[in-house]
C-alpha cells in the first residue's frame, strides 16, 4: 500500500485488497483512465494523487489498478500507445529493424489501432472513462478514435460477443456486452497560462470546452438519444470537463522546496516575538525571514478554499455518487434501452467479466495461432487492424480512381504507333490526370503502376522502331513489323548535283542514301543532270563475292601507312629527264598499276566545251543571250603580255607558273601518273576518304560530285544565277564572287625545242616573264533543309546583293576557313542551319587549267575528294563541286550540330583554304580520252 491507496498490475490483485473489494458487494464503480501522458512512467494518475511503484515498467496493453480504501471506486489505468514512453519504445524497435524501412504512415496506423483496442476494452468493462489530455485544447483526432471504436463495436463485437459471452462467467452482460453506456469525462492536465486562475475564469473555460465537445460528439453520432446506439454517454446538467488550474502535477523540485520554506515561515502579521529573535539571529542577512506574504483578505480566502475543493478526485466522486444512487443515465438519453439500467457488480463478478473481455479483445489478438470456431470472431482477429485503417482504404480508392483516369487519358491520346518522346509526353499527361484524383501515401506506388501499364500498352505493338537517322530523327515505322527501309517522316528539300532541280528527300538512315542514292534518283528527273558529264571518282571494285568493310580499332592510330611518297619536282635539266626515262623502263609493273588507277573515269571530260557538252545547255534560249556580255568579259581575261617594266608591287602579288619543257611532257606521256597505288578488292572503306585513311581502301560509292554544267557564258554577273538555271536561291544571295589572279609564266631555259618550231603561236611564249590576268568566279553555296540556297561573301556574312561584292571579297572566302554550317537567313520560328553543299567555279579562257582540291575538316578528320590526282577543270566552263550531305569517318558518324554557337562558328566543321590551284594547259593532253584527267602531273600545279 502506497500512502492511502493500493496499486497492483492486473490481474495480480493482492488477497487483502480482494477481500476489501468483496465487502463492497454490488457497490463497485469501475473507472477507466485512458489518454496521453508525457512522463517516463506513462502515468496519467498524477492528478488523482496516485503513482505506480518505483519498479514499475510501462508496457503497451498493461493495466495498473488503483483502489483507495473507504471508497466505492476502482481505478484502472490503461497504458497504451498514446503514452509518449510507449510510443518511444515502438520507435526504437522500428529503428533497430534495419531490414524494414521506417514508414510513418504505417507506424501511425499501428499506434491508433492498438489504442482503439484498449479503448474498446475500457468502454466494455468500466462505468466511467476519464480521458486525460496533456494539451490545452480538445484533440480532434479523438473523434476518429471514437468513430473507429463505434464501428468496431457495431460491425464486429456485436456479431460474436453476445454468443461467446453466454458460455463464460460473464454471461450477465451477454445481452448488451457491456456494463452500461459508459460516461465519458475529460481531464485537461494543464490550464492556459495567459488566463487568470480564478474561479470565474476556470469555470468559463470548462463550460466553453463542454459546449464544444458536446457539439462534436453529437455531430459525429458518438452520443445519440439512445443508449444502445451511443458509444459513450454525457451527464445531464453536470460538469464533465475538468481543467487542472491550481495543482502543479510535474513541478520543479527547487521551486517546490522554496514554497515549503515559504509556508514554514508564513506569519499572519508583522509583529516580532521573542522566538522570532532567535530565528533572526541565525539569518544570513537582514530581512531573510520576514513574512513573504501579506495578510489574507476574505475574497482571497474564498479563492484559496476553491482551489482546495477544485480537485480531480472531488470531480470524479460526484459522478461515482450518481452511479451509486442509480441516476447514472438520468437525463443522458431521451430513449432508454429495453434491457434496463446499468449494472453494478461485485468484485468477483466484475473480475470474471474483465478476464473474459480481456482475453477476447487483447490476449487472443496477440496470438497469431489462436484457433476459434466462431467465424465472426476469426474475422475480427484477422481483419481488425485492416478494417480500422480507413485512410488506407480511402487513399487506395482515390489512387484507383486516379489510375483509371490516367490510363484512359493515355490510351485515348495514344496514336497507332509512337516513339519514346511521345510516350513520355503521354505519360506526363496521364500523370497529371492521375493527380487530379489520386493522392496520399499510396500515390507513388500507383504512379509506378500507371507507368508500367502505359509502358506495356506502348510495347504491345505500338512501339516505333526509333532508329536514329543520320540527322538524329527517329524512325516512325512500327518496331515489330518488318520494313525494308527506315522512315522518320521528316522531309528535306535538297538540290541535285548540277543545282538546277530541287526535290523532296526522305531523312537518310545510311551513308549511301545520304550521299549517293538521292542524287542518282533526282538526276533522272533533272533534264540537265542526265546530259552533263561528271567526273568519276575512284570507287571500290570487288573481286570476290564476300567482300567486307575494313575493320578499324579504336586504339589503332590513324596513320597513312599505304600512302606513297609525294611526287618529285621536275627539274629543267636533261639529266633528270633521262633518269626518269630509265625509271620508266625499269618499272613496267608500276606503270600498269598506274594506268589501271587512272582509267576509273568512265565519262571523260573535254578541256573545252565542245559539241557534246553543248547538248547540256540546249534550251537555255534567252539566258545565253543575256550572258553574252559576261562571255565577252571572260574572253577579255586571256593572257595579257606586258613589258618587263612591271611595277614592283605587281610583281610581289604575282603567282609564278613555270612552263615545262616539251621533252618533259613527252616523257610524262610515257610514264603516266607517278602516284598510282594498288587498291584492295576485298575490303572497302566504310566511310569517306580522309587525309589519314589508307589509300589502298576505296569507298563503295562516291560522296562527292564534280560536274561541268555549261560554258562560262551561262553566268552573267549582272543578273546573277537565274531561277531557271539554279533554283532556290534567296534574293540577293545568287551572285558569284569575281576573283582576279595575276600570273607570270616562266619559260624553260632550254631553247633547242623552241628554235625547231618557228610558229606564230610559239613566238608568243618566247618572251620570258609573260604575264596573265585571270578572272575566276567563285561561289560558296549553303543550303538549308527547307531548300533555301545562298552564297557567302565572308566566313561570317551572307551575300546580300551586288553591293556586297568588292575587289577583295572573293579573297575572304578562298583564303579563310569557311564554316561548314551557318544559320539560314530565311524567316522562320525555328532556326534552321544551312550546310556548305556546293562550290561554284567559272574558269577563265586562258592557257591554264584550274585545279580543285577541297578539304573539309570535321572533328578529327579532314575529308578529301579521294582522288590521288586533283581534278583539272577545263577552260571557260561552269563547274560545280557538290560536297557530301553527311560526313562519316572510319567507323564514326559525325552528326551535324543541333545549334550553332555564335562564338564558335567553326565548331561544326570548316572548309580549309587553298583548295584552288593553277597549272599550264597541256596541248598534248586530251581530256576526252578516258583516264587522262587523272593522268596530269598534279605535283606541278601552283596553289592559288
UniProtKB/Swiss-Prot annotation:
<feature type="compositionally biased region" description="Polar residues">
    <location>
        <begin position="628"/>
        <end position="650"/>
    </location>
</feature>
<dbReference type="InterPro" id="IPR019354">
    <property type="entry name" value="SMG8-like"/>
</dbReference>
<comment type="similarity">
    <text>Belongs to the SMG8 family.</text>
</comment>
<dbReference type="GO" id="GO:0000184">
    <property type="term" value="P:nuclear-transcribed mRNA catabolic process, nonsense-mediated decay"/>
</dbReference>
<feature type="compositionally biased region" description="Acidic residues">
    <location>
        <begin position="568"/>
        <end position="583"/>
    </location>
</feature>
<comment type="function">
    <text>Involved in nonsense-mediated decay (NMD) of mRNAs containing premature stop codons. Probable component of kinase complex containing nonC and recruited to stalled ribosomes.</text>
</comment>
<protein>
    <recommendedName>
        <fullName>Nonsense-mediated mRNA decay factor SMG8</fullName>
    </recommendedName>
</protein>
<feature type="region of interest" description="Disordered">
    <location>
        <begin position="628"/>
        <end position="653"/>
    </location>
</feature>
<keyword id="KW-0866">Nonsense-mediated mRNA decay</keyword>
<feature type="region of interest" description="Disordered">
    <location>
        <begin position="560"/>
        <end position="597"/>
    </location>
</feature>
<dbReference type="Pfam" id="PF10220">
    <property type="entry name" value="Smg8_Smg9"/>
</dbReference>
